[in-house]
């Protein structure tokens, strides 16, 4: 029969107290057990058009060549993308930009060197979907819902940094953008803005890629209110 010495530490698992006494663990905000997000019907939103918005690079090869050149000058590329959600018949739908027949992307893009992530995403959202009558869109961005890294100058991205990678080439952050009850969006003519239901995205990497198809899991922590 073993006896616990009287001076033995009573901290650590399973009592919920870290054995390090919080010496190496940064204090965080109190855990939010339920995060509520208001969703509004797709019919509440008006979609106009504006001049085409073209990619900086003419091909995938050109994109990685530019990434390589910029990495040598300014380091890792920082990218932000916005997740906009509406509902139809009380089913959440994510707004996606469609280019051609098979390519889908979230609105967003590259940050400028030193640019704040949230302010940069607001700038990009305005460039891509902002209205043209001079009325500024109020983008509400409170939640980062995902991080993806590109370890090499190649297409694969991962929701973690592989163990052997010390200098990722790109860091992509996904943010939930909370929409107002009503809004007007101006969509570049070379894109379509489509509302894809979560059940279509789920486990559908062949159709939407690994990042967009992971959104149902990332969004499952929210409590949606269907207005």
From Swiss-Prot:
Q: Give the modified residues of type N6-acetyllysine.
A: 23, 29, 56
Which biological processes are named by the entry's GO terms? Answer: cell differentiation; co-transcriptional mRNA 3'-end processing, cleavage and polyadenylation pathway; mRNA 3'-end processing; mRNA alternative polyadenylation; mRNA processing; positive regulation of pro-B cell differentiation; positive regulation of stem cell differentiation; post-transcriptional regulation of gene expression
How is this protein annotated for GO cellular component? centriolar satellite; centrosome; cytoplasm; mRNA cleavage and polyadenylation specificity factor complex; mRNA cleavage factor complex; nuclear body; nucleoplasm; nucleus
Q: Does the keyword Acetylation apply?
A: yes
What SUPFAM superfamilies does the entry give?
Nudix (SSF55811)
Where expressed (tissues)?
A: Expressed in the heart, brain, placenta, lung, liver, skeletal muscle, kidney and pancreas.
Provide the residue span(s) of the region labelled Necessary for interactions with PAPOLA and PABPN1: 81-160
Swiss-Prot/TrEMBL keywords? Acetylation, Cytoplasm, Differentiation, Methylation, mRNA processing, Nucleus, Phosphoprotein, RNA-binding
Q: Name the domain of life this protein comes from.
A: Eukaryota
- What region holds the Nudix hydrolase domain? 76-201
Alphabetized GO MF terms: chromatin binding; histone deacetylase binding; identical protein binding; mRNA 3'-UTR AU-rich region binding; mRNA binding; protein homodimerization activity; RNA binding
Q: Identify the residue span(s) of motif Nudix box.
A: 109-130
This protein's major location comes to nucleus
Which Gene3D superfamilies does this one have? Nucleoside Triphosphate Pyrophosphohydrolase (3.90.79.10)
The residues annotated as site (Interaction with RNA) are 55, 63
Q: Residue positions of the PTM Omega-N-methylarginine? A: 15
Membership in a protein family: Belongs to the Nudix hydrolase family. CPSF5 subfamily.
Assembly information from the UniProt record: Homodimer (via N- and C-terminus); binds RNA as homodimer. Component of the cleavage factor Im (CFIm) complex which is a heterotetramer composed of two subunits of NUDT21/CPSF5 and two subunits of CPSF6 or CPSF7 or a heterodimer of CPSF6 and CPSF7. The cleavage factor Im (CFIm) complex associates with the CPSF and CSTF complexes to promote the assembly of the core mRNA 3'-processing machinery. Interacts with CPSF6 (via the RRM domain); this interaction is direct and enhances binding to RNA. Interacts with CPSF7. Interacts with FIP1L1; this interaction occurs in a RNA sequence-specific manner.
Listed name of the protein: Cleavage and polyadenylation specificity factor subunit 5
The uppermost taxa in this organism's lineage are: Eukaryota, Metazoa, Chordata, Craniata, Vertebrata
